[in-house]
UniProtKB/Swiss-Prot annotation:
GO molecular function, one term: naringenin-chalcone synthase activity
Name of the encoding gene: CHS
Principal EC category: transferase
EC number: 2.3.1.74
InterPro entries from the UniProt entry: Chalcone/stilbene_synt_C, Chalcone/stilbene_synt_N, Chalcone/stilbene_synthase_AS, Polyketide_synthase_type-III, Thiolase-like
Entry annotation: catalytic residues: C164
Entry function: The primary product of this enzyme is 4,2',4',6'-tetrahydroxychalcone (also termed naringenin-chalcone or chalcone) which can under specific conditions spontaneously isomerize into naringenin.
Protein name: Chalcone synthase
Catalysis performed (reactions): (E)-4-coumaroyl-CoA + 3 malonyl-CoA + 3 H(+) = 2',4,4',6'-tetrahydroxychalcone + 3 CO2 + 4 CoA
Matches recorded under SUPFAM superfamilies: Thiolase-like
Length: 389
């Protein structure tokens, strides 16, 4: 007779969780950041607010964003004037859009990840779906399971309303699932659409305007599993260690509230300061066991909440400018896509590392860190180990 300990041991994987594939997707509608203020104030019938428009133009100029992708086109917004007002009841219209479009965009990213993985989708055992764009029952996880044709007994986890730190959260959960369920293959999907947050400008709510200058739409998917099958599965990164913490004295720093008017955001001015003040401790906990204290010796994937956060983190840690290159490139080309951002950066980094002839998926380095920052203020930390190219 086998013991309980033997049964437990047999259920667990032998090696660490690895990322086996990455896929990304964006809506076709591309928005140029340099002309966005003109478009935004015109479509929201706010062109008379000249001072506010100038302020918004400065926000967009300082954002370090060149372009973003958005599901919302001019035609859609003209059909839904309440979404263009500052605080008009519009939740039904927003919900009708996102409950369809969030799983649809997620499917596009997931299909690419499954193709790269190269295994039949029947081998997917778990699904994690994450979005801050709309809520429904059954959820986007159910819709995606149906749309992809996954087996009905795939174990699903639906994460709604997590916000910008959740790219780290999904990797933490996927790591635990992969390492504690032998043979598990976890499909992780983050899909975000700004139709829930788009609204007209107001000079009494400038943090809403910050969101209008930064947020973009995108979906990213990864396959996570332990003990990759040799010659069949090709790991890209190992997920070595994870943590989540609430920054002290940060209550109200980033809040989001779902109301009749859609999802509203409230930001304290010192969000970059709170993040940079707490980053040292998070890094020490993560890398002290590895005897790493030189943070220029690791590769960096940080949620690009905005350029000010990246600037202050760089300054606090004395990071070389090239450390945040992949992060800044994704911010520039896509804007802040909330939970999907860090997965886009992982994809960007492994592609550029290969293109530039570097030895590992982590810009030629062995160890790296992935950070998520969001409501709470919550900080997610993931220690990554790159793979030889």
């Amino acid at each position: 007779m086998v013991s309980v300990a033997e049964i437990r041991q047999a259920q667990r994987a032998e090696g660490p969780a690895t990322i086996l594939a990455i896929g990304t997707a964006n809506p076709p509608n591309c928005v140029d950041q340099s002309t966005y203020p003109d478009y935004y104030f015109r479509i929201t019938n706010s062109e008379h607010m000249t001072e506010l428009k100038e302020k918004f133009q400065r926000m967009c100029d300082k954002s370090m964003i060149k372009k973003r992708y958005m599901y919302l086109t001019e035609e859609i917004l003209k059909e839904n004037p309440n979404m263009c007002a500052y605080m008009a009841p519009s939740l039904d219209a927003r919900q009708d859009m996102v409950v369809v479009e969030v799983p649809k965009l997620g499917k596009e990213a997931a299909t690419k990840a499954i193709k790269e993985w190269g295994q039949p989708k029947s081998k997917i055992t778990h699904l994690i779906f994450c979005t801050t764009s709309g809520v429904d029952m059954p959820g986007a996880d159910y819709q995606l399971t149906k749309q992809l044709g996954l087996r009905p007994y795939v174990k699903r986890y639906m994460m709604y309303q997590q916000g910008c730190f959740a790219g780290g959260t999904v990797l933490r959960l996927a790591k635990d699932l992969a390492e504690n369920n032998k043979g598990a293959r976890v499909l992780v999907v983050c899909s975000e659409i700004t139709a829930v947050t788009f609204r007209g400008p107001s000079d009494t709510h400038l943090d809403s305007l910050v969101g209008q200058a930064l947020f973009g739409d995108g979906a990213a998917a990864v396959i996570v599993g332990s003990d990759p099958i040799p010659q069949v599965e090709k790991p890209l990164y190992e997920l070595v260690w994870t943590a989540q913490t609430i920054a002290p004295d940060s209550e109200g720093a980033i809040d989001g509230h779902l109301r009749e008017v859609g999802l509203t955001f409230h930001l304290l001015k010192d969000v970059p300061g709170i993040v940079s003040k707490n980053i040292d401790k998070a890094l020490f906990e993560a890398f002290n066991p590895l005897n790493i204290s030189d943070y220029n010796s690791i590769f960096w994937i940080a949620h690009p909440g905005g350029p000010a956060i990246l600037d202050q983190v760089e300054q606090k840690l004395g990071l070389k400018p090239e450390k945040m290159k992949a992060t800044r490139d994704v911010l520039s080309d896509y804007g802040n896509m909330s939970s999907a951002c860090v997965l886009f950066i992982l994809d960007e980094m492994r592609r550029k590392s290969a293109e530039n002839g570097l030895k590992t998926t982590g810009e030629g380095l062995e160890w790296g860190v992935l950070f998520g920052f969001g409501p709470g203020l919550t900080i997610e930390t993931v220690v990554l180990r790159s793979v030889a190219i």
